[in-house]
C-alpha cells in the first residue's frame, strides 16, 4: 500500500504538491530527500518544453523525457561560465538565491540514483555520454564533477572522420540501451568537435495487465484524411477515470509496478491544443483529486514510440540559452578553447504492451440488461504522461498523433488475429 500512500501525498495540494514529505520519521525534507527540492522547477520546465515542441511540430508525434533533459542541461552548466551558466540554470527554473549550485547538483545526483535503482519488473536505461574530438582534453574538474554528480561517460573520437565517428556513437548508444535506440546519427556534421548525448529507454510492467488474447487490429484516426491500423489492447477493470468538466477531455490513470504511474488523456476531437495549453502542475493536481474508480472497458494502442531532439537549437528558440552560439562560453569543459558546443542530443524511447503483474480479466460478455461499464477508446491522437511518484519526476511527456511512426527496432506491432469490427471514418470514431 506504500505506492498508494505516496500517490496521495504527491497530489495532496497545489501548495504542497512538490514539497510534502513522504511517509517517514525524518521531517527534514532537504536532508532526507534533496531531489524533491528540484521537483517544482523540473515539472514547470517539463511542461514549458513540451508545449514548445508541440507548437513547433503540428500534426506530429512529440515524445521527451523532461527529467532526463533537465539532468543533461544541469550537468552541462558545470562547464559553462559567466552569463551562459546563469542562463542555463535560470532556464531550468532555478534561483541561486534559494538553492546553491552545489545543492542543485547534489539533488540531481540523488535523483539520478533513485531513478536508476534496480527494479526487476521494468526496463529503464538512462544516461549521458560525451563524445569529444581526440584533439581536445577535458578539464580535470569538469571530468570529476560530471562523473560524481551525473555518472557521465566521456569518450574520444575522430570527428574529421564523421562516418567512423557516427558509427562509434551509434554503436555505443545501441549497446547501452540493449539495442532499443539505434542509428541516432546519420547525416554528416564535419564541424562537430563535441557532442553530448542524453538517452533514456523505458518499458514497464502494469499492476493490472491487458488481456493478451483480446488485442486486435483496429483503426486509429490520425486525422480527417489518414487512418492507420494499430494493435489495440484491451482490459475491463475498475480504473481511475475522469470525464473532465473543465477541459474537453477524458482520462485514465494506470499504475506500473514500482513507483511509475501513467496518465492517458483523450481530448475531444479538434481540442488537443486546448488541453495541452492547460497542462500544468495545477491541472495534474486537479485531475488527481477528481479521478474516481470506475468500471471501464479500456482500449489503448500497443505502442513503441521515440523522439530525438537537438537541444542546442531548442533552448535558443525558447530564449533559455543558445548553446550553439559563439556568444556562449563553455571554457570550463576542455583545456583548449571551446567557444560553443556542437550538439546536445536527447533521445527518449518507450514501449507500451500488455504485460502486467496480475492477470487481466477475460473479455467481457454482457448477459444481463444491467448498466455496463463505460467504454473508452484511444483511437485518435492522445496525450501520455508518465510520472515517478516517489521522486515526483516527469519521466515522459508525449503527444501521440500516429502510433505507427517512430517504432523501435524489434517492436512487434502487427498481429495475425482478425481485426475487431469497427466503424469507418474520422467522424465515426468514438
UniProtKB/Swiss-Prot annotation:
UniProt xrefs under SUPFAM superfamilies: Serpins
Site residues, Conserved cysteine within steroid binding domain: 249
Alphabetized UniProt keyword annotations: Glycoprotein, Lipid-binding, Secreted, Signal, Steroid-binding, Transport
InterPro entries: Serpin_CS, Serpin_dom, Serpin_fam, Serpin_sf, Serpin_sf_1, Serpin_sf_2
Residues the record marks as carrying a glycan: 119, 175, 243, 259, 326
Annotated residues for binding of cortisol: 253, 285, 392
Domain notes: Proteolytic cleavage leads to an important conformation change. This reduces the affinity for steroids.
Descriptive protein name: Corticosteroid-binding globulin
Source organism of the structure: Ovis aries
Amino acid at each position: 500500500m506504500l505506492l498508494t500512500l505516496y500517490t496521495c501525498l504527491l497530489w495532496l495540494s497545489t501548495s504542497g504538491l512538490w514539497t510534502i514529505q513522504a511517509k517517514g520519521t525524518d521531517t527534514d525534507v532537504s536532508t532526507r530527500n534533496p531531489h524533491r527540492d528540484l521537483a517544482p522547477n523540473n515539472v514547470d520546465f517539463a511542461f514549458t518544453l513540451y508545449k514548445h515542441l508541440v507548437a513547433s511540430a503540428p500534426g506530429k508525434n512529440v515524445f521527451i523525457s523532461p527529467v532526463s533533459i533537465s539532468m543533461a542541461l544541469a550537468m552541462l552548466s558545470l562547464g559553462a561560465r559567466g552569463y551562459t551558466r546563469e542562463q542555463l540554470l535560470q532556464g531550468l527554473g532555478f534561483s541561486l538565491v534559494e538553492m546553491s549550485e552545489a545543492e542543485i547538483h547534489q539533488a540531481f545526483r540523488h535523483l539520478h540514483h533513485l531513478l536508476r535503482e534496480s527494479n526487476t519488473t521494468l526496463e529503464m536505461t538512462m544516461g549521458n555520454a560525451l563524445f569529444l574530438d581526440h584533439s581536445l582534453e577535458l578539464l580535470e574538474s569538469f571530468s570529476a564533477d560530471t562523473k560524481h554528480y551525473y555518472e557521465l561517460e566521456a569518450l574520444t573520437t575522430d570527428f574529421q572522420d564523421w562516418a567512423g565517428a557516427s558509427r562509434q556513437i551509434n554503436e555505443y548508444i545501441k549497446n547501452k540501451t540493449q539495442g532499443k535506440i539505434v542509428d541516432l546519427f546519420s547525416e554528416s556534421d564535419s564541424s562537430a568537435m563535441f557532442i553530448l548525448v542524453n538517452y533514456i529507454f523505458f518499458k514497464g510492467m502494469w499492476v493490472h495487465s491487458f488481456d493478451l488474447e483480446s488485442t486486435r487490429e483496429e483503426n486509429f484516426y490520425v486525422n480527417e484524411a489518414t487512418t492507420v491500423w494499430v494493435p489495440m489492447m484491451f482490459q475491463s477493470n475498475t480504473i481511475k477515470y475522469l470525464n473532465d468538466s473543465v477541459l474537453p477531455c477524458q482520462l485514465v490513470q494506470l499504475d506500473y509496478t514500482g513507483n511509475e504511474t501513467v496518465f492517458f488523456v483523450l481530448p475531444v476531437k479538434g481540442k488537443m491544443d486546448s488541453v495541452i495549453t492547460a497542462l500544468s502542475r495545477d491541472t495534474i493536481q486537479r485531475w488527481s483529486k477528481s479521478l474516481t474508480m470506475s468500471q471501464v472497458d479500456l482500449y489503448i494502442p500497443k505502442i513503441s514510440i521515440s523522439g530525438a531532439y537537438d537541444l542546442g537549437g531548442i533552448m535558443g528558440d525558447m530564449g533559455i540559452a543558445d548553446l550553439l552560439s559563439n556568444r556562449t562560453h563553455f571554457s570550463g569543459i576542455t583545456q583548449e578553447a571551446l567557444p560553443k558546443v556542437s550538439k546536445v542530443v536527447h533521445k527518449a524511447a518507450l514501449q507500451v504492451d500488455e504485460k502486467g503483474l496480475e492477470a487481466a480479466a477475460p473479455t467481457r460478455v454482457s448477459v444481463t440488461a444491467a448498466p455496463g461499464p463505460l467504454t473508452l477508446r484511444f483511437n485518435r491522437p492522445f496525450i501520455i504522461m508518465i510520472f515517478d511518484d516517489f521522486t515526483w519526476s516527469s519521466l515522459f511527456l508525449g503527444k501521440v498523433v500516429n502510433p505507427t511512426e517512430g517504432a523501435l527496432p524489434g517492436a512487434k506491432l502487427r498481429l495475425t488475429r482478425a481485426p475487431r469490427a469497427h466503424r469507418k471514418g474520422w467522424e465515426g470514431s468514438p
